[in-house]
Amino acid sequence: MEQARALLQGKTVTIMGLGVHGGGCAAACFCAEAGARLTVTDLRNADALTPSLKRLRAYPSIRFTLGEHRLEDFENAHVVIKNPIVKGAHNIYLSAAQRAGARIETDISLFLRLSPAPLLAVSGSKGKSSTASALCYSLRALGFPAFLGGNSTVSPLEFVRHTTPATPVVLELSSWQLADLRAVDAQDHTVHHAGLLRPEIAIMTPIMADHQNWYADMESYVADKQVLYAHQGTHDTLLCNADDGWGPRFACEAQKNGVRVFWYTAQSPETACRACTPRLMERALWRATDGTYWARFAEGDRACMLIPPQLHVPGRVLQTQVASAALAALLFAQRHSLPPSSCPPCFCAHSHSPAYANHASPPDYACPSAHSPFQEHTRRLAQALESYTGIEHRLEFFYEKGGLRFYNDSASTVPEATIAALEAFDESVVLIVGGTDKNADYQPLAQAAAKAHALYLLAGSATARLQPLLHAAQVPFYGPFTSLEVLLQDLRARQKSPGVIVFSPGAASFELFAHEFERGTTFKSQVRIIFE
């Protein structure tokens, strides 16, 4: 906390955007405890901010400007801490603050300035939260006292004072948070400034057309994602998805800076190699046809089984996210805690097993030595992952009644995520979709929806765009319904046989809900009431 006091004590600080997700609240608590003269401003009124305001009652010195922003709160500030949802470009209040000499920060940038912890970071379009959560879980399973923070979890300012060089931190970072870090770096631009964000290990999940109601085009969206690895160097590692068309570009750019690139794929190495480059599998993780995951840690290494097939999360998409997180955790362990006396063959005893026989090429590589994580780490992690069930709102199995199994995938806010949810199940499912449009392409979803046993639509602007596409594809549906309660009551009346019900909206939530988490919580609550 001494560093924080040196940075903030006695300074006039304005927090722009309190919100209700915790980031603004954490920043306010942190700054107040560091001795800042603090103003919190938000365009929403006090009623909309009740949960956050209740927490801040413990800090009576905080001044609030609610329901509006005032220029004087920015012109008189030494530091402005902005919420990621606030657009920085052409914002009159942030411009006024900068003209007056104020620094623009975020909760993430403050954390990166103050924490001595080794950093692992995750970004991409979908799968960020699942991957980051599985990575933190894997690190803890290996004995590291890891923290998890960022986009969909707690602000890292909640735990920054507890971090040390021995406590790895996993940050999940959205495109908006990454864009803010680039802007902060631009303020700090000197010959010695190397960028605040430099994760030892970074994972890029697949890129999809997300937030296109915010960005001018895909290139500007992807440019923000590239901040994830922009300042990595020769001692750092980037995991790229070999099934993603953007993966080769990310890998090429990172390798120019000497970054070590690992590939991961939900396919066999032969299929993935055709999609990328012939040298893709020098360092890589892939999925065998029996559901096991195999890895090669360096060119010439023997392939070794990393993850046995007992994962409980459904579908190859989620399972590949968990496997990539496990690989990242093992790479971190390799760098930080490998005992010198252990033999490192991972599961090399299984390298000639029937699982590997699914591949065209026999495992004729040299047995890995210094490049592979040690056997006890791999075994311990494999055992721990057998009980890993994923996280809330991401294909979350939460209820079963009368032969009906319910999955909450409310964090699915783009059509591609819903398509992936459909493909996660071997059986035909009852699918619930619909919500608020983000200028996405719904044609592929309309075609994929034909695979569903039944389709229910929740009302919204995205649903209005989807309906004519469903008609054109001759896909029948029920709805649209203006509430989850009415939708589920109709579903219960119609559903006479056992089956799987998946709520995977494929759209944003804002016309009916505050955010996707409220949407998912409402769905679970209504299911338990209606199907009791």
From Swiss-Prot:
Record-linked InterPro entries: Mur-like_cat_sf (IPR036565), Mur_ligase_C (IPR004101), Mur_ligase_C_dom_sf (IPR036615), Mur_ligase_cen (IPR013221), MurD (IPR005762)
GO BP of this protein: cell division; cell wall organization; peptidoglycan biosynthetic process; regulation of cell shape
GO CC, one annotated term: cytoplasm
Protein's UniProt keywords contain Glycosyltransferase: no
Sorted UniProt keywords: ATP-binding, Cell cycle, Cell division, Cell shape, Cell wall biogenesis/degradation, Cytoplasm, Ligase, Nucleotide-binding, Peptidoglycan synthesis
Transmembrane regions listed in the UniProt entry: none
A GO molecular function held by the record: ATP binding
Keyword Cytoplasm in record: yes
Pathway as given in its UniProt record: Cell wall biogenesis; peptidoglycan biosynthesis
Residues that hold ATP according to the record: G124, S125, K126, G127, K128, S129, S130
Swiss-Prot/TrEMBL catalytic activity: UDP-N-acetyl-alpha-D-muramoyl-L-alanine + D-glutamate + ATP = UDP-N-acetyl-alpha-D-muramoyl-L-alanyl-D-glutamate + ADP + phosphate + H(+)
Location of the protein in the cell: Cytoplasm
Listed Pfam families: Mur_ligase_C, Mur_ligase_M
Enzyme nomenclature, EC number: 6.3.2.9
Primary location class: cytoplasm
Function: Cell wall formation. Catalyzes the addition of glutamate to the nucleotide precursor UDP-N-acetylmuramoyl-L-alanine (UMA).
Protein family according to the UniProt entry: Belongs to the MurCDEF family.
Record-given protein name: UDP-N-acetylmuramoylalanine--D-glutamate ligase
